[in-house]
């Protein structure tokens, strides 16, 4: 899997069951903007030392925080959640 996936490619991988989106944004960000369907909220600090394995795609608001995981060979959504929204991909409300 490429290390930086365009939002559409990340969503396709999720729909095919090949990947899971790990959302490293804060709870405030998730509540304010929503989240991709099925995205799992995770702590970036906990995952910096040991990112999840293949099939994990990290997502932050603007693809800045998620770059930390790239150094460990993980994948990220290129452009972050902002690019996800710009692409018109599905978003769920977060309570």
What role is predicted for each listed range?
Residues 1-20, 27-57, 62-95:
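Rhodanese-like catalytic fold shared by cysteine-dependent sulfurtransferases
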